[in-house]
């Protein structure tokens, strides 16, 4: 008996569910279902109504952020057929289509199935898109390619998603052992590849309200046993998660109710019980990349792969907003390049991998409209102009900040990548950023509260050294670009990059921020 997968029966049921959801979305459009009730249904299908309830978002689940040529071609066709205005690369390595009509959402869900895109469980109290280091399989220095485990875990979780009822969502990430951009240190489950072929596992971490660093649950977890540990977490979460208070329903709150040591004990006990089901044992071998290349390339966006002669190209559309024309352009170009594929990264960067030097040069030309500095790779959630939950329009703020920094001629490196969230949910990961912003309001003397952002300083997601930043005040939204410009000017005047300057002279950093809070 093999590992449970999304077999034909599962897919047939999924198609039937899409038909039922089509009726639901149209009932909502006709005012027959309240917004809150609709959200509880639509999230399970990876779709939400936007702030303008006539428009909808659909989240395309991409295990490990992997965009195969078939998936890229499907999306390129879909944006043309349905006139999709824009797409959003997400911090969970998915791609969202926005401003869709009630007719378009179920139609795209159905059309996505043949290329392996399943939107089921893309929202709501479900296992979310499983993340993997975006350059896994090609990154120099990695322990091993973790993509097969991310994909196997996705198959398993989707196969059982109808049979489990968790208190809230579950986020799982796999790190290849080079960097921790997927935030394994503070996920519900974070697997870190080790040089001996095992995984280190952290559990019950998370950003947002009541944030917690994950607790170490296993030092050398056999790779073949990954699904037993996932099953053990689901059992533990269902046993001890909070079904009464959604604000305290994520796995991280089990650290409070049970305590870290007891949580670890209960979890490992449930893992041991799960091992009675021998069908969950994995036997995976990463696919070998046989493509070779010649020539060299020197460009800050071109990354040499561990395969000699091959490169990955980084493309970061500002704010992670991808225009449909660019998607179509990339599909047309990459369809002529054998062996390449795309990867969505948690910082909203799109990597195009397995390129020769000449192919990489062509991709660099096609993506020249993206971020040109570290600061321009800053992360912002979709923001309050679209998101129902949002408090501030993080996308607008980022666009204004990028423009201000460009006009001030701040040199590359003087400012770090910043992360901007429109609310407390930390969708941008602002709590783990060198500089993070969280949407809020701030009192105005003698007036009404004004749009503002809480400032987080000093966070890091560095592998083995991850920690969360400190809140140091609140800046009015209209002054946020000026604050960043002044910080960048100070670092540049010192002749240092942000990391060096902020570490060497924290008093100077704080004195500048103090003028704005």
Identify the function of each model-found stretch.
Residues 41-47, 73-84, 203, 235-238, ...:
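Short amphipathic beta-strand starts and helix->beta connectors
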Residues 85-89, 160-167, 238-255, 262, ...:
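Flexible, glycine/charged-enriched surface loops at secondary-structure junctions
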Residues 99, 103-107, 111-116, 238-302, ...:
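Terminal amphipathic helices with adjacent charged low-complexity linkers/tails
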Residues 2-4, 29-33, 55-198, 228, ...:
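Small-residue-enriched alpha-helical segments and adjacent helix-cap loops
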Residues 2-4, 8, 166-265, 433-496:
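Mobile "lid/hinge" segments at catalytic clefts and subdomain interfaces of large enzymes
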Residues 1-71, 179-180, 191, 294-310:
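N-terminal basic/disordered segments at the start of proteins
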Residues 46-52, 83-89, 239-244, 301-307, ...:
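Short, flexible, solvent-exposed loop/turn segments with mixed acidic/basic and small polar residues
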Residues 304-311, 318-344, 484-486, 490-493, ...:
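Long hydrophobic segments that form regular secondary structure
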């Amino acid at each position: 008996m093999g590992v449970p997968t999304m077999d034909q029966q599962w897919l047939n049921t999924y198609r039937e569910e899409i038909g039922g959801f089509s009726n639901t979305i149209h009932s909502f459009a006709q005012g027959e279902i309240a917004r809150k009730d609709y959200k509880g249904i639509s999230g399970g299908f990876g779709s939400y109504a936007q702030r303008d309830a006539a428009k909808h978002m659909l989240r395309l689940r991409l295990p490990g952020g992997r965009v195969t040529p078939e998936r890229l071609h499907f999306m390129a066709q879909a944006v043309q057929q349905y006139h999709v205005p824009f797409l959003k690369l997400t911090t969970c390595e998915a791609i969202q289509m926005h401003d869709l009509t009630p007719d378009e959402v179920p139609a795209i869900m159905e059309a996505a199935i043949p290329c392996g895109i399943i939107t089921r469980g893309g929202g709501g109290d479900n296992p979310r898109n499983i993340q993997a280091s975006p350059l896994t399989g090609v990154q120099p220095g990695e322990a091993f390619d973790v993509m097969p485990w991310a994909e196997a875990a996705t198959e398993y979780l989707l196969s059982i998603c109808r049979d489990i009822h968790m208190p809230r969502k579950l986020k799982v990430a796999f790190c290849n052992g080079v960097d921790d951009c997927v935030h394994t240190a503070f996920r519900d489950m974070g697997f870190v590849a080790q040089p001996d072929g095992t995984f280190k596992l952290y559990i019950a971490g998370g950003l947002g309200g009541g944030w917690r660093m994950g607790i170490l649950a296993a030092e050398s977890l056999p790779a073949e046993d990954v699904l037993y540990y996932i099953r053990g977490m689901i059992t533990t979460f269902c046993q001890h998660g909070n079904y009464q208070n959604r604000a305290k329903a994520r796995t991280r709150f089990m650290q409070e109710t049970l305590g870290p040591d007891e949580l670890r004990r209960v979890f490992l006990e449930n893992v041991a019980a799960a091992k009675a089901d021998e069908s969950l044992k994995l036997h995976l071998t990463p696919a070998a990349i046989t493509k070779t290349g010649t020539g060299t390339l020197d460009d800050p966006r071109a990354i040499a792969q561990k395969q000699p002669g091959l490169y990955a190209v980084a493309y970061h559309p500002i704010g992670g907003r991808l225009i449909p024309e660019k998607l179509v352009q990339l599909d047309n170009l990459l369809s002529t390049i054998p062996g390449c594929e795309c990867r969505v990264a948690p910082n909203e960067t799109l990597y195009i991998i397995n390129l020769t030097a000449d192919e990489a040069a062509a991709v660099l030309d096609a993506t020249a409209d993206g971020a040109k500095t570290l600061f321009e790779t800053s992360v912002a959630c979709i923001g309050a102009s679209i998101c129902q939950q949002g408090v501030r329009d993080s996308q607008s703020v980022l666009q204004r900040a990028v423009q201000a920094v460009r006009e001030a001629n701040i040199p590359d490196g003087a400012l770090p990548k910043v992360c901007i969230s429109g609310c407390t949910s930390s969708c941008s990961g602002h709590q783990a950023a060198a500089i993070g912003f969280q949407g809020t309001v701030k009192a105005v003397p003698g007036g009404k509260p004004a749009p503002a952002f809480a400032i987080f300083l000093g966070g890091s997601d560095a592998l083995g050294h991850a920690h969360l930043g400190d809140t140091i005040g609140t800046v009015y939204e209209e002054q946020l670009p000026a604050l960043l410009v002044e910080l960048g000017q100070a670092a540049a005047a010192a002749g240092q990059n942000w990391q060096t300057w902020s570490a060497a002279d924290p008093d100077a950093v704080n004195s500048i921020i103090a003028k704005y809070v």
